[in-house]
Amino acid sequence: MSRLDETFDALGPDEKAMGLFLTDGFPNPDATVPLLHAIDRGGADFIELGMPFSDPLAEGRPIQRASARALSHGVTLPDTLRTVEAFREDSDTPLLLMGYVNPVFKYGVDAFCRDAAEAGVDGLILPDLPPQESDALCDAAAAHGLELVFLIAPNTSDERIRVVDERATGFVYAVSVTGLTGSDLAETPSVDEYLMHARDFVAQNPLLVGFGIKTHDDAMELSRHTDGFIVGSALINRVEALWEDPERSTTDRLDTVEGFARHLKSGTPVPTPQPNPA
């Protein structure tokens, strides 16, 4: 059984799995591993680590900015694999890489899956990979023990949802809106009906929902018909604000991020950042 499967199996009654997204190299390369450990301590059931890319089509402005900043620091795909290796020294929490197919194809599909697995990656999420064109990646991922997650959206047909469920391993990622990450949930009043409908067609995998979740209440409301939720832009925004505030110490920044993760999972109050001691 994979680490991700074990995580889902270990959830308590009515407990929702929480996945948290961070971009590798953001806000700077030295901060990524400590941030990963902070959200791990805060209760992340699994982590998505973004592979920086110059044209992240599905991402809203926060994650676009994070990716651009990471690239400005010179972060490469091999660097991201080294980040995973460093994280793995102290954690067994499932970690999936999220990004786009071009860098993976450039690296070499089998070589990438091999090196990712050796680094300690548990799975891949590639939003621009159509399931009908995924044979090579499906085969390579399976050969190296990696999960391969596919996405659905409110405009995904029933037949395509079935295909996604057949192709996916790990879970199916239901984006809550047809748009960019970080979009406002209030702009999609039919999201509840969409997730109830998707639940009827996703039979082989857990169903998780993401895009637009900013608070614990958002997460609980949106995940009523799913097995869990994923938060990205809200976490990126908080990290960005903390690292741009010169009054915050590194310890306080990490403690605040850990507290935000705990809030998303269990509803504890969001911690108030403390300034550097005078």
From Swiss-Prot:
Disulfide bridges in this chain: none
GO cellular component, one term: cytosol
Top-tier EC class: lyase
Recorded superkingdom: Bacteria
Keyword Lipid metabolism found: no
Keyword field: Amino-acid biosynthesis, Aromatic amino acid biosynthesis, Lyase, Tryptophan biosynthesis
Residue positions of the active site: 48 (proton acceptor), 59 (proton acceptor)
Signal peptide, first to last residue: none
InterPro entries assigned: Aldolase_TIM (IPR013785), RibuloseP-bd_barrel (IPR011060), Trp_synthase_alpha_AS (IPR018204), Trp_synthase_suA (IPR002028)
Catalytic activity: (1S,2R)-1-C-(indol-3-yl)glycerol 3-phosphate + L-serine = D-glyceraldehyde 3-phosphate + L-tryptophan + H2O
GO terms, molecular function: tryptophan synthase activity
EC number: 4.2.1.20
Functional pathway: Amino-acid biosynthesis; L-tryptophan biosynthesis; L-tryptophan from chorismate: step 5/5
Cross-referenced PROSITE patterns: TRP_SYNTHASE_ALPHA (PS00167)
Function: The alpha subunit is responsible for the aldol cleavage of indoleglycerol phosphate to indole and glyceraldehyde 3-phosphate.
Subunit text: Tetramer of two alpha and two beta chains.
Protein name as annotated: Tryptophan synthase alpha chain
